[in-house]
């Protein structure tokens, strides 16, 4: 039987697959993420997810490999993971009191088939005070997350409204993924 391999070291993606009872192993993709001249955030996340999955699939061609990538956008500006605390603060100030978009792209690669898809979710933040932002940054939580916040952690207190898939904002649209895996004859709904 073909194994499912997650090409990511993200603890959040690991937790979501476990939550859905998807059997998998982890092989972290060491690919250097490169963003080319893409026309849209959806193209970017699907391309990055495919790069990650392809790097692992190259040496695991008998198995099914999952890659994923998440970005936050606000007014056509891409907000990836902050490089330092100052950049995290700048991002949180930018998102304060506003609605932004979170895109998560997923690639599923098997020997005979490749599927890519994305989910787009709108997230609206409350107005944030400087003290709230500083305290959050001091927790270190935002430093490894796209857009400088984790909706599943302390960053949840900043969220006023969400429209779309919550789990996509966490890092993996698990409901859609489970449905897409059926194309590969993997059905975890009866597990």
Swiss-Prot record:
* Gene Ontology cellular-component terms listed: cytoplasm
Pfam family membership, one: Maf
Origin: domain of life = Bacteria
Q: Tell me its cofactors.
A: a divalent metal cation
- The EC class name is hydrolase
What is this enzyme's catalytic activity, as reactions?
dTTP + H2O = dTMP + diphosphate + H(+); UTP + H2O = UMP + diphosphate + H(+)
What organism, scientifically named, is this protein from? Bacillus cereus (strain AH187)
Q: Name one GO biological process term.
A: nucleotide metabolic process
Family assignment?
Belongs to the Maf family. YhdE subfamily.
Q: Sorted alphabetically, which InterPro entries does this protein's record hold?
A: ITPase-like_fam, Maf-like
Membrane-spanning intervals of the chain = none
Q: What's this protein's name? A: dTTP/UTP pyrophosphatase
UniProt site (Important for substrate specificity): 12, 70, 152
């Amino acid at each position: 039987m073909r194994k499912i391999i997650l090409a990511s070291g993200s603890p959040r993606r690991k937790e979501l697959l476990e939550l859905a009872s998807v059997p998998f192993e982890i092989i972290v993709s060491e690919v250097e993420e490169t963003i080319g001249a893409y026309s849209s955030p959806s193209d970017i996340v699907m391309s990055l997810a495919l790069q990650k999955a392809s790097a692992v699939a190259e040496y695991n061609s008998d198995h099914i490999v999952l890659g994923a990538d998440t970005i936050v956008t606000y007014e056509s500006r891409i907000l990836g993971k902050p490089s330092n605390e100052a950049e995290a603060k700048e991002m949180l100030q930018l998102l304060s009191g506003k609605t932004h978009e979170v895109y998560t792209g997923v690639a599923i690669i098997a020997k005979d088939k490749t599927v890519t898809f994305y989910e787009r979710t709108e997230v609206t933040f409350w107005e944030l005070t400087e003290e709230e932002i500083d305290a959050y940054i001091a927790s270190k939580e935002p430093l490894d997350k796209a857009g400088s916040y984790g909706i599943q952690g302390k960053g949840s207190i900043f969220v006023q409204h969400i429209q779309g898939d919550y789990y996509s904002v966490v890092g993996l649209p698990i409901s859609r993924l489970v449905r897409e895996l059926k194309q590969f004859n993997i059905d975890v709904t009866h597990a």
